[in-house]
């Protein structure tokens, strides 16, 4: 942790020469207490606050630039700041993560920087009190909701699936199933049974799963009607927001009761709450078998939302990220069942390898686009909740500027590698370093806003 703090202090000292790379103080209690730089007089006024969750390593540094150079010069918004950097999570016994989630419940919109989920090596590196849980998991457990991942499409970035000309958004039901299962190894012959004992005192129900003639493995897993219903509401509301059709995939032909329950709950909620709205937007909802859906996705041009059970969503979201070209061009939004509360972030991690180079004083070429889109998706949603068309227009303009900047040929090394191959790319010929790329986006944004 000491090394982490030294780097941040050195960055703060460097800011005196006009550098845009000084991150916020690691334990700043509230962003509003931090000094403001020279912002425009005619910034877009935002009536209600946005929760800001700061993060770790290279993304933390980029996050500060985005906020100070791309967002706040144009948007007058009160940011409820929470430092989710690993040192502060450890210092507060992870209470800061809980507080940030509760603030999101209160204010309905949060933007989050990528954070470290510590393993044993990180516990040693930061001298942590304990191995703290994933902040994303903690936030999801408090807010509920569904994580939707959506690619950012740039025409000049090759796709492994060339036919995907429109985005495909995956909604993963991040609750239960294999991820909360009880699994075990059987070392001898015997009978595997599952028993359900009702709380009302009525007799238990028992199912025989398998008679093992010898060793093997077994598993028991579950989900709840409440969680499946929340998942369904989030998916239907997200599809309406995007004005895209929604597909839900299961294997209900095999898991007739388990996956059949997902299918039945989705259909009932659709008929009761959303069919009229879907018809109005000329979009539709369909259930598909997972194997049929995978085949259809590969053949499609995109432009839909795909609701997946937990394991399917885990696997298919990574396939989509690679199929569209880069995890650095993937957004992630947690949408709660109330249809009002969201938390937006980049789909990638803290870019540790680049941060190690940055600590040594070496320039990096780190892709900031997904982090920028975390801000824009959060601000756009704030604008929709508040009826603030200027804020919506700003968020959409910044997203358009990012895409057009890449399509004009200015990009970071990861994207240049998608086009030319990583071994063939050269700095300033095929790609820019991090600061130059961000400065290019800033110049293009200022120009685009000046033309409105």
Swiss-Prot record:
UniProt record similarity statement: Belongs to the isocitrate and isopropylmalate dehydrogenases family.
Main location: mitochondrion
Source organism: Bos taurus
Cofactor: Mg(2+); Mn(2+)
GO molecular function term, any single one: isocitrate dehydrogenase (NADP+) activity
PROSITE patterns tied to this protein: IDH_IMDH
Residues at the site labelled Critical for catalysis: 179, 251
EC number(s) recorded for this UniProt protein: 1.1.1.42
Catalytic reaction annotation: D-threo-isocitrate + NADP(+) = 2-oxoglutarate + CO2 + NADPH
List of residues binding Mn(2+): 291, 314
Subunit structure: Homodimer.
Protein's UniProt name: Isocitrate dehydrogenase [NADP], mitochondrial
Enzyme class: oxidoreductase
Keywords: Acetylation, Glyoxylate bypass, Magnesium, Manganese, Metal-binding, Mitochondrion, NADP, Oxidoreductase, Transit peptide, Tricarboxylic acid cycle
GO terms for biological process, alphabetical: 2-oxoglutarate metabolic process; glyoxylate cycle; isocitrate metabolic process; NADP metabolic process; tricarboxylic acid cycle
Cysteines engaged in disulfide bonds, as pairs: none
PTM note: Acetylation at Lys-413 dramatically reduces catalytic activity. Deacetylated by SIRT3.
Entry GO terms, CC: cytosol; mitochondrial inner membrane; mitochondrion; peroxisome
